[in-house]
Amino acid sequence: MKCTLRWTITALVLLGICHLARPAYHKKCGRYSYCWIPYDIERDRRDNGGKKYCFCRYAWSPWQCNEEERYEWLRCGMRFYSLCCYTDDDNGNGNGNGNGNGLNYLKSLYGGYGNGNGEFREEYIDERYDN
């Protein structure tokens, strides 16, 4: 019995280590798939087609989301996250040179530019939370 218990504990520990060390994976959320890096939720995400770009940040209620963001619940592993997510669906009025005004929110945060349709096509890493 003692030996069986010891092996059971060893197996559970190894299983836990393997679970925590899993690589990034894609998670479907609404119409979008997010690329999740374990324990790093504040990174650039896009769907498998490489066309939709999205940025999510932690939020406790829909009232915290800006006008161009959507409130979402996302399960990642065993944890649940409530998020405000920006997507490129807003299709702002572009002037043809990539400075579309549909991305003023992201442009002000990251200094990026869109494709003239208000779509944010720059890959970025949010560094506001690194401090």
Curated annotation (Swiss-Prot):
It comes from the Eukaryota. It is found in: Secreted, Extracellular space, Extracellular matrix. Keywords: Disulfide bond, Extracellular matrix, Repeat, Secreted, Signal. Its main location: secreted. The keyword Signal applies. Residues 1-23 form the signal peptide. Component of conchiolin, the organic matrix of nacre. Expressed at extremely high levels in the dorsal region of the mantle, which region may be responsible for the nacreous layer formation, but only in trace amounts at the mantle edge, which region may be responsible for the prismatic layer formation. The keyword Signal applies. One of its GO terms (cellular component) is extracellular region. Sequence repeats lie at residues 91-92, 93-94, 95-96, 97-98, 99-100, 101-102. Residues 91-102 are annotated as: 6 X 2 AA tandem repeats of N-G. May be specifically involved in the formation of the nacreous layer. Heterooligomer; disulfide-linked. Pif97, Pif80, N16 and other proteins form a complex. Belongs to the N16 matrix protein family. This is N16.1 matrix protein.
